[in-house]
Amino acid sequence: MSRVAKAPVAIPAGVEVTLNEQTITVKGTKGSLTRVINADVSVVVEDNEIKCSSVEGVKTAAQAGTARALINNMVVGVTAGFEKKLQLIGVGYRAKIAGKGVDLTLGFSHPLVHELPDGVTAECPSQTEIVLKGTDKQLIGQVAAEIRGYRPPEPYKGKGVRYADEQVRRKEAKKK
């Protein structure tokens, strides 16, 4: 069995977990999440704990660890939630919230509007910062990657959209 899958997922107070064949639903104070679990993994809910184990074979042991990590992210998401911070670095690079989307000015001839999917909210503490919040870790990471993809940080001046905890490796300019 996977080392990750050996540890059970604790169910905190106020969280309700329902298991219907291979579909698991987790409901909490911040909302509810549903996910289909791989058929090679057996999931058992007992004594305020969720236990994952592989059905048989070595190749399915990795799937049990993945399922346990995904279920843990669901439990954390509906209780505490997740957030991802983006920074806009560059002259004239700005962001503002416009309805159900983020209005981005990133040095193009036109402003970009990135529509946010359901389950993700954004706020701009300053013009050069975006904070994405929600319950689904995968969805927040996907939206952050899409916004970063409009203008990824370049290695010479460091301009672009980057994650708050990202280190951009700088290059030296070509010399004559």
From Swiss-Prot:
Swiss-Prot/TrEMBL keywords: Ribonucleoprotein, Ribosomal protein, RNA-binding, rRNA-binding
Domain of life: Bacteria
Location of the region described as Disordered in the Swiss-Prot/TrEMBL record: 151-176
GO biological process: cytoplasmic translation
Residue ranges with Basic and acidic residues bias: 151-170
Molecular-function annotations in GO: rRNA binding; structural constituent of ribosome
Gene3D superfamilies for this protein: Ribosomal protein L6, alpha-beta domain (3.90.930.12)
One GO CC term, this protein: cytosolic large ribosomal subunit
Pfam families: Ribosomal_L6
Physiological role: This protein binds to the 23S rRNA, and is important in its secondary structure. It is located near the subunit interface in the base of the L7/L12 stalk, and near the tRNA binding site of the peptidyltransferase center.
Recorded family membership: Belongs to the universal ribosomal protein uL6 family.
Subunit: Part of the 50S ribosomal subunit.
Protein name: Large ribosomal subunit protein uL6
Species this protein is from: Shewanella piezotolerans (strain WP3 / JCM 13877)
